[in-house]
Amino acid sequence: MKVKGMRWWVLGLIVLVTIINYLDRNTLGIMWAKIVEDLGLINTEGLSEAEFNDLSKKLFRDINMVFMVAYGLSQMFSGKIYDKIGTRRGFTISALVWGISDLLTSLTTGVKGIASARAGLGLGVAGPWPGAVKSNAEWFPQKERAMAQGFFNAGASIGAILAPILIAVIYAAVGWKWTFVAIGVLAPLWVIPWLIVNKKGPKEHPWITDKERDYIISGQPECNVKSDKGLSWGQLLSKRKSYAVILGRFFLDPIWWMFVTWLPIYLGQKYGMDIKQLASHIWIPYVGAALGSLAGGWMSGFFMRKGKSVGFSRKAAILIGASILLPSLVFVAFVQDPMVAVSVMAIILFGYQFTINNIQTLPGDMYTGKSIGSLAGLGGAAATLGTILSMLFIPMLTAGDNWTPFFIMGASLVPLSLICVFLFGGKIEHDALVENNTKQ
């Protein structure tokens, strides 16, 4: 049996599991207020509403810090693991770990149980990020990789769009405990079609047509086709251009996590939204994110089709996205109307995904073979570290329900990321010589 467009079937399954990934991530934040109430996580005696909100934010931050530490460690090691065992087994392990962890949250009765379940979730949900970069480098010619990465990132945004709606509907029907079960079971179920479809890589897959196989391989750098051994972390860290990814993501990724983690809390505390009201508002910013993912991938591909170099194409797209992101973050800091706020946030996340999509593609542009997942993992670990450090300040910055400093902090991170990408990136091309030397 031969299947036309096999690479798109593989990518489609990765997009699907990314949607599921973001459903699992968002369960806690959307239902947080009700979980705090039902489990009595905060003693409300003698507390004003503002004091209760501050304590709730601190507790939510602490639990998410546990999640982020696990997520960061997983990002760092998942890249190496995916490089070693391949994307087929790598995605399988990740999906099983995070799905079971989210499902087990339904059994928790206190802060320690919730934190433990979120740690397991963090270990699992991190894997697809270095895994997708590696899979796209294997399955797509270079000119299509940013678009493939755009579809992957759009999956995260679609998951974030669907999460408040699905979670609110399931919660209204069966309560928060069974909502964790219903969402948690999806990732293990996804493993079944994944193992059936993704049998081998494009060079050996029995279903791929000869035409598509030749198209993929001929569109990849020659060193990528021949390379079979990757660089060590030490070798990657010794090269200046690696820091375009590592530091670029260290500064930029916290902006995404500010919204993913804190947007439900922000809308709930500033505008008094309950779960149903959140469901009708919180999806709007992620529509912008999904469109930005696709537009950012298309833009760099457009430049390459016009004959521009890979380096010019990626950097131009990064600069365009950042020019949308930065002023929008400053503007939203002073908005008071909830509909205006979420609409501007759609522009913010459009610019963010436009930018990060091209930064995330850089490992496949700079290195080859079994180095791609490793650098993507190091970049993800740095991104998590930056997010953890920024989260430490958020309860302090938003004390008294003043969220303006929250957005100003996000705006300050954009130029720092740009400086790192342009300062360290240099000429973006594959480091074939170093990788080939590792074989000798």
Describe these PLM feature segments.
Residues 9-45, 259-264:
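Extracytoplasmic
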Residues 28-30, 237-294, 355-360, 390-391:
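Extracytoplasmic gate region of multi-pass secondary transporters
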Residues 31-73:
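Extracellular/periplasmic helix-loop-helix junction of adjacent transmembrane segments
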Residues 61-80, 283-296:
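Central cavity-lining transmembrane alpha-helices of secondary-active solute carriers
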Residues 73-111:
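Conserved MFS/SLC helix-loop-helix module at the cytosolic interface between two early adjacent transmembrane helices
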Residues 86, 107-113, 124, 141, ...:
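Helix-breaking motifs and short loop linkers at transmembrane-helix boundaries and internal kinks
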Residues 117-156:
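Cytoplasmic helix-loop-helix junction between adjacent transmembrane helices
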Residues 155-205:
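Helix-loop-helix hairpin linking two adjacent transmembrane segments in secondary transporters
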